[in-house]
Design a protein with these regions (language model features):
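Long, contiguous bundles of hydrophobic transmembrane helices that form the permeation core
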Residues: 2-32, 315-351
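Residue-level recognition of pore/gate-forming positions within transmembrane alpha-helices
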Residues: 153-157, 243, 285, 304, ...
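Conserved, well-structured core domains of diverse proteins
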Residues: 1-114, 124-128
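Transmembrane-helix bundle segments that line or gate the permeation/cavity pathway
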Residues: 6, 104-108, 112, 256, ...
Length: 353
């Protein structure tokens, strides 16, 4: 087996296969410019509103959703096998429809609020189009299973008043669905989107800036210097670097690519069994979602729902995160002792640094 670090192309292939959010298509120059414009705009918008105050809830969330949906349909193909092709014609249509639906909510937010949850035919039309687009975006970026489950519940909400027995609801139909899922902040423009449009994206932006400044390489060098020559050193490097990388990235797949492309070949080079090297990196990278301050989007939604400051959620996550990585670290040490896996030799340690 090769012990050389993964090439960037191979790492991208692995991400596209196992992580839907990294299955990006190859963009032409002008499409890439459009995506960059929307990305820059929403980044500056989030920083501005964080510093000088947010827009009304529906405007803040609809503008954020507008940019996110346009970027999604231009960047992520409908199927992974199309990732090397250009943007399909229907994706331009989806991006334009997303732009129009979200712009409608942004411009008419006062009129929508003044109607107190009573939708008209235009609202219902926009709701249907936007709901379909969100389901398709979820299928591409998260999983088809989540879109299917959501679709089942939407169908149930529509036909609930004609369902038999205990499954029957008091009312159903498109009007009631639009009233609750589009006109008031309980559905599409609810608190999960509000959390993403305020806190989550700021932390993701901060994480991207740190990674772009070379923080990932610095973390690996520090971990290598601390534990590289101790018993089970290369595996401990994976644990420490993954824990530290988790503070700037809440995604397990990104953690694996950020640290595993270095630590897995290093462990194999030092005589570690390939399955042991892979298992250590998988466990260490998965735990990155437990480490503050990012901790994944679910943490921010949790803070929104239970009504406590995010700082308290973050502090509460310190102890479980520490215990998790301490247990992985001790397990690696004991397993390395049992297998007779020593640390790196001085010349290997110096060359890697």
């Amino acid at each position: 087996a090769s012990t050389e670090p993964l090439r960037a192309e191979r790492a991208d292939e692995i991400l596209r296969e196992y992580s839907p959010e990294d299955n990006e298509r190859q963009l032409t120059k002008w499409v890439a410019r459009v995506v960059n414009v929307f990305s820059l705009f929403i980044s500056l918008f989030l920083v501005y509103t964080a510093a000088f105050g947010q827009l009304p809830a529906m405007q803040q969330r609809s503008l954020y959703l507008l940019c996110a949906m346009v970027i999604l349909f231009l960047v992520y193909p409908a199927f992974s096998k199309h990732s090397k092709k250009g943007v399909a014609w229907y994706d331009y249509l989806f991006a334009a429809a997303s732009f129009g639906c979200c712009l409608y909510a942004f411009v008419n937010y006062e009129d929508i609020l003044l109607r107190f949850g009573i939708s008209n035919s235009t609202d219902q039309f926009v709701f249907v189009i936007l709901a379909v687009l969100i389901l398709e975006g979820t299928r591409r970026l998260v999983s088809p299973a989540l879109s299917l489950i959501t679709l089942i519940f939407l169908v149930y909400a529509y036909f609930g008043n004609v369902m038999p027995g205990m499954f029957q609801t008091k009312a159903g139909g498109l009007t009631r669905m639009a009233d609750h899922m589009f006109m008031i902040p309980e559905g599409i423009f609810g608190s999960p989107l509000g959390t993403a449009a305020t806190y989550v994206s700021l932390f993701v932006l901060f994480s991207s800036l740190l990674q772009g400044c070379g923080m990932g390489d610095f973390i690996q060098d520090v971990a290598l210097g601390l534990t590289g020559r101790s018993t089970g050193g290369p595996a401990k490097v994976a644990v420490i670097s993954s824990a530290a990388f988790g503070t700037i990235s809440g995604a397990a797949a990104a953690n694996v690519v950020g640290t595993g492309t270095f630590t897995i070949p290093l462990m194999k080079k030092c005589g570690y069994p390939p399955e042991f090297a892979g298992a250590v990196e998988a466990c260490a990278s998965t735990g990155g979602q437990l480490i503050p301050p990012v901790m994944g989007a679910a943490c921010f939604i949790m803070a929104e729902y239970i009504g406590v400051p995010y700082s308290e959620i973050m502090l509460a996550g310190l102890v479980p995160g520490f215990l998790y990585y301490m247990s992985v670290f001790v397990t690696v040490h004991l397993r390395s002792k049992k297998l007779g896996l020593n640390g790196m030799r001085s010349e290997e340690h110096t060359s890697e640094l």
